[in-house]
Amino acid sequence: MTVTEIARAEGTGKGVDRNAGRGGGSTRRLLPSLARLRLVSGLVLFAFVLTHLLNHALGLVSIAVMDVVQTWRWTIWRSAPGTVLLYGAFVVHIALGVRSLFRRRTWRMPVNDALQIGLGFAIPVLLVGHVLGTRGMHIAAGVDDFYEPVLRRLWPEAVSQSLLVVIVWGHACIGLYHWLRPKPWFPAVAPWLLSAGTALPLLALAGWIEAARRLELLDHGREVPRWPNGETAALAGWLAEVGNQLVFAFMGAVGLGLIAVRVATRLRAKVRISYGGGRLVRARPGPTLLEISRMN
C-alpha cells in the first residue's frame, strides 16, 4: 500500500488500522475528548489572562481603578469554584501539553508549533515565582496583594515581569489562532483580532509600568512599608526556593520522559512505507505519515 493510499484510509477511517488488536478504537475515541479538554482548559486560562491584562492596562488611569477592578476579578477567580476551575485548568493544560509532546516523534514542525512549545516551557520559569510571591504570600502570611504593595515589590523585577506578560500572551494567542483558523468566518475577523491581540499586551505593559513609576514618585521622601520585612523575609525565601525546586523537578521530569520515549521508539521494529516513484522508507511505528514524511 502506498503512502497516498494509507493517508486516504486513515482519513476515512477505513483500510489500515495501525492500532488494530491493541485497543486502537478506544484510543481514537479518547483522543478527541482529550483534545476538547485541552481546548477548554486553555480557554479558561485565556479568560484569566485576558482579564488580568485588562486590569493592568487600567494603570494608565489610576491605581485606585486598578484595585476596584481587581476586587471584581477576585470575586470570580478567588471564590472556591473559581480557584478550583483556574488551578484545575492549569494542571490539566500542562499535563495534556506534556502528553502531546511525548507523543511527538519528530522535532521538525512549523514555526508556530515550535514557538508555542518554547513559550509554554518558559512560562513556569517566570510564573511560579510571581504566583508564590503574590497569592502564595497572601495565603501563607496575609500579605496585602492589592496593586500598590505588589507594584512596589515587582518594580525592581520590571524586565522579567514584562517578559512574562509577553510570553504568556504569545503562547495563548498562538493556541487561539490554531483553534480559530479553520472557522469559515476567521479570515474576515482576523485583522481585528490581530490588532486587539497586539494592542492589549502593549496597553497592559504601559499600564502597570506607568502605575509603578507613578507610585515610585509618590513614595519618594516618605516612609513606606517595604517587603519582605523581617517577619516575612524567611517565608518569602522559603517559597522562592520551593518554586525553584518545582520548576527544576518539572523540567527534569519532562526531559527524562522525552529521553525515555525516544529510546523506546528506537527499540521498536520498523515498518515500510512506499512512495510514488518507487521510493521506500523504513520507519518505526508511532509517528504519523506526515511526521514520517518530514523526517525523510
Predicted region positions:
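Membrane-embedded alpha-helical bundles that constitute the cytochrome b-like, heme-associated redox core
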Residues: M1-A269
